[in-house]
């Protein structure tokens, strides 16, 4: 314990330049870098914000069928060929429902325009 107290006293007596030189010498001796954890933490904090700003995939959600329900049902069947007439009708009548998931921004915008032209209300999430 006495050795540790002596080390603390010796380190406290160093000037800023001497402390910086000591840090460099320890980095070389131990093969580490004191700056790496700081850089990783800064990059890690910025990544989620960038991901939130640049969303590339969207879900097309039918929020309301509107007055032209038959046209909207036909469009749902066109967009999702796996759905039969009954499933498409149930989807439209059960709005809000997700019509397509993980669609590119351009495709999502195109689908939104088609649904709005058919009288439906659509959200991109």
Swiss-Prot record:
It comes from the Bacteria. GO terms for molecular function: mRNA binding; structural constituent of ribosome. CDD domains: Ribosomal_L7_L12 (cd00387). One of its GO terms (biological process) is translation. One of its GO terms (cellular component) is ribosome. Keywords: Ribonucleoprotein, Ribosomal protein. The keyword Ribonucleoprotein applies. InterPro entries: Ribosomal_bL12 (IPR000206), Ribosomal_bL12_C (IPR013823), Ribosomal_bL12_C/ClpS-like (IPR014719), Ribosomal_bL12_oligo (IPR008932), Ribosomal_bL12_oligo_N_sf (IPR036235). Forms part of the ribosomal stalk which helps the ribosome interact with GTP-bound translation factors. Is thus essential for accurate translation. HAMAP family: Ribosomal_bL12. Homodimer. Part of the ribosomal stalk of the 50S ribosomal subunit. Forms a multimeric L10(L12)X complex, where L10 forms an elongated spine to which 2 to 4 L12 dimers bind in a sequential fashion. Binds GTP-bound translation factors. Belongs to the bacterial ribosomal protein bL12 family. This is Large ribosomal subunit protein bL12. It comes from Hyphomonas neptunium (strain ATCC 15444). The lineage of its organism: Bacteria, Pseudomonadati, Pseudomonadota, Alphaproteobacteria, Hyphomonadales.
């Amino acid at each position: 314990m006495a050795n540790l107290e002596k080390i603390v006293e010796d380190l406290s007596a160093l000037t800023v330049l001497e402390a910086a030189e000591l840090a460099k010498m320890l980095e070389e001796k131990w093969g580490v870098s004191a700056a790496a954890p700081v850089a990783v933490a800064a990059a890690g904090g910025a990544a989620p914000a960038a991901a939130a700003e640049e969303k590339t995939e969207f879900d097309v959600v039918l929020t309301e069928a509107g007055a032209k329900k038959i046209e909207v049902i036909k469009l749902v069947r066109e967009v999702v060929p796996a759905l039969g007439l009954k499933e498409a009708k149930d989807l439209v009548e059960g709005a809000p429902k997700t019509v397509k998931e993980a669609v590119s921004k351009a495709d999502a915008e195109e689908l939104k325009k088609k649904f709005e032209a058919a009288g439906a209300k659509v959200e991109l999430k």
